[in-house]
């Protein structure tokens, strides 16, 4: 299945809200309109610095289970400024969720 961006938001925003994610950004083939049935879903999530790796992995598991697809769920707190992933996020990123 190829989800629309709105479908991804609808499925994941309750998880992000419950788990206190600060911001989640979709990037990769889904934002470029190149996604196929075999495409994974690329998401970078910014979380509180105090969040444990176990809690972050729990969020990733919930996201994967909700979407039923392979997901590259990245810890955005450690993305290198102006590195490859940072540039991809700036170029192609679509905001899925932002805590108010």
Predicted feature locations:
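Conserved H-loop
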Residues: 29
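Short, conserved active-site loops that position catalytic residues or coordinate cofactors/metal ions
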Residues: 39-41
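Short hydrophobic/aromatic beta-strand micro-patches
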Residues: 44-48
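Catalytic core of pol beta-like nucleotidyltransferases
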Residues: 1-23, 32-37, 49-100
